[in-house]
From Swiss-Prot:
Family: Belongs to the gamma-glutamyl phosphate reductase family.
Name recorded for this polypeptide: Gamma-glutamyl phosphate reductase
GO BP annotations listed: L-proline biosynthetic process
EC class of the enzyme, as a word: oxidoreductase
Catalysed reaction equations from the record: L-glutamate 5-semialdehyde + phosphate + NADP(+) = L-glutamyl 5-phosphate + NADPH + H(+)
Organism of this sequence: Mycobacterium leprae (strain TN)
Biological role stated in the UniProt entry: Catalyzes the NADPH-dependent reduction of L-glutamate 5-phosphate into L-glutamate 5-semialdehyde and phosphate. The product spontaneously undergoes cyclization to form 1-pyrroline-5-carboxylate.
Pathway(s) of this molecule: Amino-acid biosynthesis; L-proline biosynthesis; L-glutamate 5-semialdehyde from L-glutamate: step 2/2
Keywords, sorted A to Z: Amino-acid biosynthesis, Cytoplasm, NADP, Oxidoreductase, Proline biosynthesis
Pfam short name (any one): Aldedh
Location of the protein in the cell: Cytoplasm
Length: 409
């Protein structure tokens, strides 16, 4: 299996070199062709997904996991739409970030270039297969994809559609390759392919991400766990707070930007907590803590990915910041308040990739941010942080123009 992974990486390197200098118009045309192909092959994709779902149900898979795995016509249309959105976005490659002329006449320019060969390890969600391809391709990168065994048939069907679209445009099919999900060693070989793979992005649960970070020999961009908070400040409009809380928790509880903890300001807890807890329970959410007292520490640390939420009381905005910085995962936090000074203090003090002021945590998403799609939501601080779009899939290089200058001794 090691040889198979390395051979795939070498083919990806060849494709990446072609993509790095490919004109924007060619990339955009190919992405639109891929979108059309995905839509045209909806029936085949749904049939493959049905097999994955049937196998998952036979093993008593959790409802949240089934939701992430499932495709329907609407989700396939969204996948194709994401490719069209990426095609419509500006090409980051060649963008000049800064440039200036030195006293000796040398002209310096720093510009964006592709990362190269990007490995992607992900669980469950087959839409990531196409999202990763779209962002990698537009930014001039070749993608090595390793999805989960639970979505193997769905991922294979999607990659076959992408390959056919690329070949129809006389472009290298090796720009996107699907590694075997049947052998767990493919993950190890991918994350240890130093010199063949430029970066690996794991997207999944804490166990997957921790294992990849621990064992990797190539650079990793963590797309972290989402223990997201909604803090209802003492100056909150409670109708707005209730609306934001329910959307953050119940819109799609199985995704990483769903709220997992509600923090209520002590100054308003007596009359606010019963209302918000009742709203949550009325929507089918199981409340941990709240009216029965503060939740256990384990509940405060948990990414439920289900219709569960921890509820706790904090003594003001500084206590909310301290709580989030201790228990949060650096993903997305929201404050609901009409006090803009408190909102700014919260935004400045919380150490997370995204801070929402009077808005749902569900907006932390590449599509919502105008990226067309996202490769993941990075919770680390180096290279990229927050939703990763096209720009985050690039590096930079310096180009220096001269007319014969030499450096003095």
């Amino acid at each position: 299996m090691r040889q198979e992974v390395h051979d795939a990486a070498r083919r990806a390197r060849v494709a990446a070199r072609a993509l790095a200098v490919m004109p924007t118009v060619a990339k955009d045309h190919a992405l639109r062709a891929a979108a059309t192909a995905v839509t045209a092959h909806t029936e085949e994709i749904l049939a493959a997904n049905a097999e994955d779902l049937q196998a998952a149900r036979a093993t008593d898979t959790l409802a949240a996991t089934l939701d992430r795995l499932a495709l329907d016509r609407q989700r396939i249309d969204q996948i194709a739409g994401g490719l069209r959105q990426v095609a419509a976005l500006p090409d980051p490659i060649g963008e000049v970030l800064r440039g200036y002329t030195l006293p000796n006449g040398l002209q310096l320019r720093q510009q964006r270039v592709p990362l190269g060969v990007v490995g992607m390890i992900y669980e469950g969600r087959p839409n990531i297969t196409v999202d990763a391809f779209g962002l990698a391709f537009k930014s001039g990168n070749a993608a090595l994809l390793r999805g989960s065994s639970s979505a193997a048939k769905s991922n294979q069907a999607l990659v076959e559609v992408l390959h056919a679209a690329l070949v129809s445009e006389d472009l290298p099919a090796d720009a996107v390759q699907l590694l075997s999900a049947a052998d767990r060693s493919t993950v190890t070989h991918l994350i240890q392919a130093r010199g063949l793979v430029d970066v690996v992005i794991p997207r999944g649960g804490a166990n997957l991400i921790d294992a990849v970070v621990r064992d990797a020999q190539v650079p990793i961009i963590e797309t972290g766990v989402g223990n997201c908070h909604v803090y209802v400040h003492q100056a909150a409009d409670l109708e707005v707070a209730e609306r934001i809380l329910l959307n953050s928790k119940t819109r799609r509880p199985s995704v990483c930007n769903a709220a997992e903890t509600l923090l209520i300001d002590a100054a308003i807890a007596d009359h606010t907590m019963p209302r918000l807890v009742a709203a949550l329970q009325g929507a089918g959410v199981t409340v941990h803590g709240g009216l029965s007292g503060d939740p256990d520490k384990a509940d405060l640390c948990r990414e439920y990915l289900s219709m569960d939420i921890a509820v706790a009381v904090v003594d003001g905005v500084d206590a909310a910041i301290a709580h989030i910085n201790e228990y949060g995962t650096g993903h997305t936090e929201a404050i609901v308040t009409t006090n803009m000074a408190a909102a700014q203090r919260f935004a400045d003090g919380v150490d997370s990739a995204t801070v929402m002021v009077n808005a749902s945590t569900a907006f932390t998403d590449g599509g919502q941010f105008g990226f067309g799609a996202e490769i993941g939501i990075s919770t680390q601080k180096l290279h990229a942080r927050g939703p990763m779009g096209l720009s985050e899939m690039t590096s930079t290089k310096w180009i220096v123009w001269g007319d014969g200058q030499i450096r003095p001794a």
